Amino acid sequence: MAVFPWHSRNRNYKAEFASCRLEAVPLEFGDYHPLKPITVTESKTKKVNRKGSTSSTSSSSSSSVVDPLSSVLDGTDPLSMFAATADPAALAAATDSSRKKRDRDDNSIVGSDFEPWANKRGEILARYTTTEKLSINLFMGSEKGKAGTATLAMSEKVRTRLEELDDFEEGSQKELLNLTQQDYVNRIEELNQSLKDAWASDQKVKALKIVIQCSKLPSDTSVIQFYPSKFVLITDILDTFGKLVYERIFSMCVDNRSVLPDHFSPENANDTAKETCLNWFFKIASIRELIPRFYVEASILKCNKFLSKTGISECLPRLTCMIRGIGDPLVSVYARAYLCRVGMEVAPHLKETLNKNFFDFLLTFKQIHGDTVQNQLVVQGVELPSYLPLYPPAMDWIFQCISYHAPEALLTEMMERCKKLGNNALLLNSVMSAFRAEFIATRSMDFIGMIKECDESGFPKHLLFRSLGLNLALADPPESDRLQILNEAWKVITKLKNPQDYINCAEVWVEYTCKHFTKREVNTVLADVIKHMTPDRAFEDSYPQLQLIIKKVIAHFHDFSVLLSVEKFLPFLDMFQKESVRVEVCKCIMDAFIKHQQEPTKDPVILNALLHVCKTMHDSVNALTLEDEKRMLSYLINGFIKMVSFGRDFEQQLSFYVESRSMFCNLEPVLVQLIHSVNRLAMETRKVMKGNHSRKTAAFVRACVAYCFITIPSLVGIFTRLNLYLHSGQVALANQCLSQADAFFKAAISLVPEVPKMINIDGKMRPSESFLLEFLCNFFSTLLIVPDHPEHGVLFLVRELLNVIQDYTWEDNSDEKIRIYTCVLHLLSAMSQETYLYHIDKVDSNDSLYGGDSKFLAENNKLCETVMAQILEHLKTLAKDEALKRQSSLGLSFFNSILAHGDLRNNKLNQLSVNLWHLAQRHGCADTRTMVKTLEYIKKQSKQPDMTHLTELALRLPLQTRT
């Protein structure tokens, strides 16, 4: 291609801005406006005549601001009209019926405020473990009865099933001995799966045999420490069985015509379902032993709904009385817990049965301290303090069920009944664990009196105080009692010798102290914790509790100047000597500071303490630290840095940033934040001085610039460095530090060749060229206003950058280099204008320095021609079939650049634009719609006074036709 000279179009930026500005249109009152709120007319209709085909109505209208979506209703909501015309009496009746139904449902359904059994299950399994050997009886499946004829009479079938049941009870089982706890759990899981498999294969009798076998296991207390966990595992199987039976009977009530509603009555169930249900209850009634008969019947208690409305209410008292036949108090209380659990699931409104269970339990409570239990404990070698903690899971659950939405009078009666019993620490603990926190808190002094009277031997008092403290963390006691409560509790807590007992109790009461008292009392508590946990390095075994103490303290002390003035707070942190734990605590502290610190601070106490905390977090970073962890630590440290401000003392602020850089050099995001902060500091200085720096402030901003220039090379991210060089150079330029700005821009230019082909973005490798293009476009926008250095040639920075772009190894089949050259052409065109588009205050750009000098313009045009030659050469290489679409796109892009920035009165440039137009359409690859819009734009521009030459150009630009 021939060489084409470049001639830039003279631009009048003010006139162009004026022509692009939207025309202001005066708006009369009441005219439509797109931002005006929509008003909808609401019609209130009153029905006058109910009979006959016509009715008269009276309406009143009012305007109101409503949701824009309501505008589609054209005034009146049809549902509102329907409601307005409804019969008031019918509406009232419907409302009353709905309210009664809702009240009934509220009583029959347990709300979300009731803690479900599933939440306690995992805790019980984790807490009650054993290393002793266990035994279990496994059902050995018999083939007897599996094959039968379909012609057997109903009585024969029943007799056969009962015989199978007898066969199981008479010894079709195998006892496995010397099982570890895990083996035992695995066997139970196998039984659960066997139950499901038998049910799925329609072997209902086998399923029942498995359940009976499992329901015998609660009677075995040979390894008593494991009993609560055994109970959980066995009741899981019972729950599965109950669910399978219920769903089976429920499915019998569903036919092709109707579906049984959730709240159905026995009348909705068909005869087949009722007969099957009775059959199950009769089978269970034939179980000879009390405990398995009780558990299996309780598991299918819900099935009574198919038989009668009063079935459940009649069965629950009977099952409650059955438990009286269980002699072992531990087995008995867990049976009551299971009955209460089933009762709450199927009939939570039947409170009388729950209460009866509780009062029956109180009558047998003395058995716990009787000779039978004591002899059993001696045989197993279990002490009473180890035996009593087996009861709370069951007792807590019974108490929770009874106290749920219970009236104050019942709770008071229960409390008084417990008070009358001797050795009632166990009961008292369950009362405090299950009753509402508000009930406990208002009677705190009464409970403290009861705790004092308890016998220490069976159940330690510190556990009772811990339970009381848990309630006081949720509800406030009377204000007049608060100090006395703390004193009474702490007298007991501080006397504890065992560090674990002490810290478990102290951790709970710290929250009460923080909530109701000042830093003085909190400091006393922290000092006492340090005193107890420091000897023999006891803190090493109690890091979770110590962490909770810190979290509770910082949750209540949002003012860090108050928090850090607590004398023992920092010594308390010194107990966290395990690095991972110490870092977690530091993260909690910094997170609280970022959330709650409202104003920037310069308090030296806060700064010194939190710098130490941040330094601890930073020093934990090593080669194995995950990126997510580094990101989190950087976020916390950056949050602290942003909240430090020394006001107008900018030098002190810079000193803080210098110190921070030395402390946090291993976290790149922190260094980036420091660079941004220092740049902002320089700009704040400029703002204070209104751009007129004194000798002192000029030296200060140069120090800020030097800080950034020194810090940026230590960063790893290539584009992070490039963007910071550019940003810092702009700040230097704004503060009239011209030589420093040149240094930043030169550093950025010298860094471009180091940009790799692929970069890691969020863990994925991506091509870097698009990011490089974006950076260079931003760079070009800055270079427009950078003045030339007097000791260097014209446009020396642009020339250096062009050389780097030329030498950079671009991807094959990539057009990014040409897009960059096109942007360079835009830059050079803007540089040739008499007055530039924008300037920096008190910085003379090249338009002022050269004043439109012909030599400068000639150099500029020569660079333009060089760039144009590169673009045209590249277009020439795209003449292959597979690259024609790229050639068309780039050709049209270059055409638009010439149209926007070139002087098309020059014949050669004009002819080049025509050639590019034809090139874009030559092979049918151009987007016709884009070409049409471009041509329309040219014709529109040609109507402007200084653009009439575009009329002739438009005539020479034909649109391609498709045949």
UniProtKB/Swiss-Prot annotation:
Region (Disordered): 43-69, 94-113
Topology versus the membrane: Single-pass membrane protein
PANTHER family linked to this entry: ESOPHAGEAL CANCER ASSOCIATED PROTEIN (PTHR13673), VPS35 ENDOSOMAL PROTEIN-SORTING FACTOR-LIKE (PTHR13673:SF0)
Protein name per the record: VPS35 endosomal protein-sorting factor-like
Subcellular compartments: Membrane; Endosome
Extent of Low complexity compositional bias: 53-69
GO cellular component terms given for this protein: endosome; membrane
GO biological-process terms attached to the record: endocytic recycling; protein transport
Keywords from the named record: Endosome, Membrane, Phosphoprotein, Protein transport, Transmembrane, Transmembrane helix, Transport
Protein family per UniProt: Belongs to the VPS35L family.
Main location: membrane
Phosphoserine found at: 265
Stated role: Acts as a component of the retriever complex. The retriever complex is a heterotrimeric complex related to retromer cargo-selective complex (CSC) and essential for retromer-independent retrieval and recycling of numerous cargos such as integrin alpha-5/beta-1 (ITGA5:ITGB1). The recruitment of the retriever complex to the endosomal membrane involves CCC and WASH complexes.
Transmembrane regions listed in the UniProt entry: 703-719
Subunit field text: Component of the heterotrimeric retriever complex formed by VPS26C, VPS29 and VPS35L. Interacts with VPS29. Interacts with COMMD1, CCDC93 and CCDC22; associates with the CCC (COMMD/CCDC22/CCDC93) complex which contains at least COMMD1 (and possibly other COMM domain-containing proteins), CCDC22 and CCDC93. Interacts with WASHC1, WASHC2A and WASHC2C. Interacts with SNX17 and SNX31.
